[in-house]
């Protein structure tokens, strides 16, 4: 793919920015780093050049249409159905190039304050408009066999999103209780129904008591990046009838990573 092709296709991406920094790491301020440490989440605008967004879009097209990558369908056949694919890095060359050559690792390294970084996983999430409801509130840590302060998920949307459609986060919740995961088969009836059983405290019903929580979300344009600690409570807003939400999360960890024993089950993403 030559530069003209990249520029032409990049111009078709909705919401892409006309101006961006040659060194986006310099856009991360001490206040951003402090906010991440305090709240467990921070959004920074205009970090990724349209060329990198195009590369991710091509990679997603390959995942959905060409590869043998398994598509995990959550709430299959229900109104909230969405697609997730895990460890695309292993099989999709565009994702490998993004992880190695884009500034994403340097951006995460500055946010979490670690000079050394390791890739844990990457995941695509695809929600088509019209019938996809909320993604239930949850933390990622109950599903992962790791813990530490220097862990971050960089969430990148390929589509412009309103504040209502964006992910939502409970600020500061990464410093509190680690709750059980949600039960996909029961969550529509009871969002606090446990994934494991009685080995971890059940999730609170955040959606029914939103006024009790410091909930953060943003209007997003392609090129913006949300950095979030896996321990922060979060959930996905519904997509509107004429919109879609295609996003990738790059999960990286730094020097203070520790193995964490979880209740007996297969981890969502094994530590390999």
Regions from the PLM with identified roles:
Residues 2-39, 44-137, 143-145, 263, ...:
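Non-heme Fe(II)-dependent double-stranded beta-helix
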